[in-house]
Amino acid sequence: MSKVLFVKANDRPAEQAVSSKMYETFVNTYKEANPNTEITELDLFALDLPYYGNIAISGGYKRSQGMELTAEEEKAVATVDQYLNQFLEADKVVFAFPLWNFTVPAPLITYISYLSQAGKTFKYTANGPEGLAGGKKVVVLGARGSDYSSEQMAPMEMAVNYVTTVLGFWGITNPETVVIEGHNQYPDRSQQIVEEGLENVKKVAAKF
């Protein structure tokens, strides 16, 4: 039985946030098509994960060197391990998030920091870093109210680009990406843009 991990990084309700609606649509469509799959859903805002900083980094280093950890470091390392192992054990992963202020919401950056661990999702070699998580099937769902398809705007899109870059670093070089954009910039076509985008989400979910 496949293990599927759904990761949502938006705490706004689906009726107010397109990426939340994309997530909801994908999950419901996938569950309907795959009733016997083992599914785990992570709502990153609800988890309120501690920032990845000195305590977790020092704890990870000390553990790798066989050094004794403080209680605080033990707790931080255990939290990182929990989510890292969950990701590594998943056969399929879906990320859903908006573009806020040109990038992803902060909880997703924290979560990705937990996952980006040398020896686990990538390793260092003489020829540079090498990804270790390439066997996973991944879908990226992104929403942005403005249209970032133009030559002027494209470099400012640091949400989907950030996530797919990190995935590539981990060896996941071909994630399927669905983006809904421009629904705020083009209010006269907003409903059509969202509806067509959600149809694409359903198609991807049905065959995932």
Swiss-Prot record:
Q: Tell me the InterPro entries matching this sequence.
A: Flavodoxin_fold (IPR003680), Flavoprotein-like_sf (IPR029039), FMN-dep_NADH:Q_OxRdtase_AzoR1 (IPR050104), NADH:quinone_OxRdtase_FMN_depd (IPR023048)
Q: Which reaction does it catalyse?
A: 2 a quinone + NADH + H(+) = 2 a 1,4-benzosemiquinone + NAD(+); N,N-dimethyl-1,4-phenylenediamine + anthranilate + 2 NAD(+) = 2-(4-dimethylaminophenyl)diazenylbenzoate + 2 NADH + 2 H(+)
| Keyword Thylakoid listed | no
**Enzyme Commission number(s) from the entry:** 1.6.5.-, 1.7.1.17
Gene3D superfamilies registered for this protein in UniProt = 3.40.50.360
The GO terms this record gives for MF are: electron transfer activity; FMN binding; oxidoreductase activity, acting on NAD(P)H as acceptor; oxidoreductase activity, acting on NAD(P)H, quinone or similar compound as acceptor
Cofactor mode of binding and number, as noted? Binds 1 FMN per subunit.
Top class in the EC scheme = oxidoreductase
Q: Which domain of life is it from?
A: Bacteria
Assigned keywords, A-Z = Flavoprotein, FMN, NAD, Oxidoreductase
What would be one Pfam family of this protein? Flavodoxin_2
Report the sequence similarity comment from the record: Belongs to the azoreductase type 1 family.
Q: What does this protein do?
A: Quinone reductase that provides resistance to thiol-specific stress caused by electrophilic quinones. Also exhibits azoreductase activity. Catalyzes the reductive cleavage of the azo bond in aromatic azo compounds to the corresponding amines.
Subunit: Homodimer.
Q: Which PANTHER family match?
A: FMN-DEPENDENT NADH-AZOREDUCTASE 1, FMN-DEPENDENT NADH:QUINONE OXIDOREDUCTASE
Q: What is this protein called?
A: FMN-dependent NADH:quinone oxidoreductase 2
What lineage does UniProt assign to this protein's organism? Bacteria, Bacillati, Bacillota, Bacilli, Bacillales
